[in-house]
Structure formats: C-alpha cells, structure tokens
Amino acid sequence: MPFESIVNRKHIGILEDYMKQISKSLNIDLKFVPTSNWHESFEKTVKNECDILTTIAYKTNRENLLNFTKPYVDFPFVIATDITKPFIDDINKLKDVKIALVRGFATSKLIQEKYKNFKFVEYPSLHDCLTAVKNGEVYAAIDSLAVIGFEIQNNFLGELKVSGRIDEQLKLHMATNIENKHLASILDKALDSINDKQKHDFFNKWVYIKYENNLDNELLVRISILLLIIFIVFAIIYR
C-alpha cells in the first residue's frame, strides 16, 4: 500500500481508483483476478491468463514479455528519518551513515547502483526499514514518497518524518501480454483522459504527506523580526 492491496478478496488502493476510472472511461467491466503477490500477477499476464497488469516498473529485459503503457504514476524518492533529525538538502550528507532499503526491489537496486559508496542495509519490507530508523539501527530509509508517506501516516506518526528527497523517480506503468499491443494502446488513451485533479484525488485519498523543509518555524520568526526591525529603522530615517 498505498498503491494496491487485497483485503477480503477485494482490490483496494490508488491503482484500484485508476482501474475504476478506466472502466468508466472505456465503458467496460473489468474483472479483478486475486493473486498472492505481484510476481504471480506478473506471471499470469506473461502467460496470458490475465489481460492487464496494473503496475510494473519498466526494465529492458521485460520488453519481449509485455507491452508497456506510458508511465502513469510518477513519484520522487524521499528520505525518511527520525523527527529530531534536520532537513537533508543533499544526499551526499548521508555518505557516512547507514541507510535502509527494501530487499529485492528493482528500485532499491537502482539506488544502490547510483550511490555505490553509500552504506546501505537491506530489510524485508518498508515497515522493517522504518522500524530500523525508529530504533536507531540506521539513520534513514529511502523509498518513494507515496509508500513512505502511507507507512508513516499509519504506523509512525509523530516518530518519523520525510526529511528530504533524491534525484530519482518511481515511474510505474501498466502492462499487457506481448501479443496484445492493441490493448496497451487503448489503456494509454484511457490513462491520458484522467486529469491532474483526479490523479491528486486518488493519491490524497490514501496518503497524507507532511514534508519537512529547511525553513522551520524558528527561522521564519527570526526573518519576520528582522524585517520588522528594518521597517522601523527606515520609518525613523525617512519620517
């Protein structure tokens, strides 16, 4: 979550809202096929047992297996820390500390390859990564804004925060079986018909993000006082 999950054999999450809109746009009924995990969904689509895979990251070695839509979900990767830690405006400031990543994710591998000299520690899930941050085992965790925001909102509110971002994006596509290029083209048109407000509504329904920035309240108060002093000085000089 928040992208998608199965609860009582029901598909929920941001992607389910996308699928409902696509169903409405195309005026067709889409039948949900429950699977035990994403890998099973991937295999069923490759074997043409399912028509649509709702979410997949593009990789060149998958081109001969699936047709990809254009990316329809695009989130920055962010840095989560304990609430007492300062704003992080440059990831290079984390070179000498431990950073948690989710084990086995293609996006985690991408980050490790780009930042080769960093001290990454892998955990089975994002929840485990953030628990490690909370317990001081690592300084920070990195993942997409959506999943970190959802996890903090539901399990670490008041303990962890989003303290910065890195120059990587999570781009997700839908996919169809390699033999069904026409369907991928139809999905692209349906996705293009979803406007920005609808996309924001889908996201905000599941995730609330409080993004830490480097202008904290104390600094804003100091700036306000300084501006007031300057105004008073000019008023005295030019009265």
Language-model segments: residues:
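Short beta-strand->loop
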Residues: L66-D74, V78, V121, L157-E168, ...
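Conserved functional loop/turn residues at catalytic and ligand-binding sites
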Residues: E49, K98, E137
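N-terminal/domain-start segments enriched in small and hydrophobic, helix-friendly residues
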Residues: L30-F32, I56, F68-D82, I88-L101
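A ligand-binding cleft/hinge motif common to bilobed small-molecule-binding domains
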Residues: H39, E43, T54-L65, L110-E113, ...
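Extracytoplasmic small-molecule ligand-binding "clamshell" domains
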Residues: M1-N64, K119-L126, L130-T131, L187
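Carboxylate-rich, polar loop motifs that coordinate divalent cations or form catalytic acidic clusters
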Residues: P86, S125-C129, A141-F150, I178, ...
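Extended ligand-binding regions for polar small-molecule ligands
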Residues: G13-S25, I83-S108, Q112-E113, L145-G149, ...
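Alpha-helical transmembrane signal-anchor helices
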Residues: E212-R239
